[in-house]
Swiss-Prot record:
Cysteine disulfide links: C29-C45
Gene3D superfamilies in UniProt: Phospholipase A2 domain
Native source organism of the sequence: Trimorphodon lambda
Protein name stated in the entry: Phospholipase A2 trimorphin
Nucleotidyltransferase is among the record's keywords: no
UniProt-annotated catalytic positions: H48
Family to which the UniProt record says this protein belongs: Belongs to the phospholipase A2 family. Group I subfamily. D49 sub-subfamily.
Length: 50
C-alpha cells in the first residue's frame, strides 16, 4: 500500500518526500493502476496494488 511504499522510500532515501516524488510515477504508483509496468519500481507498485 502507499503507506508501506512511503516508509520504504524514506528508509532508502532519507529526506525524500515519496508521495510527492513518486505518487504519480508511471501507471501503478499512486491510487489504483493498470497497464504494463516498464521498470522494477512499477513492478513493485503493481504487486502491491494487486
Amino acid at each position: 500500500n502507499l503507506y508501506q511504499f512511503s516508509n520504504m522510500i524514506q528508509c532508502t532515501i532519507p529526506g525524500s518526500d515519496p508521495l510527492s516524488d513518486y505518487g504519480n510515477y508511471g501507471c501503478y504508483c499512486g491510487y489504483g493502476g493498470s497497464g504494463t509496468p516498464v521498470d522494477e519500481l512499477l513492478r513493485c507498485c503493481q504487486v502491491h496494488d494487486d
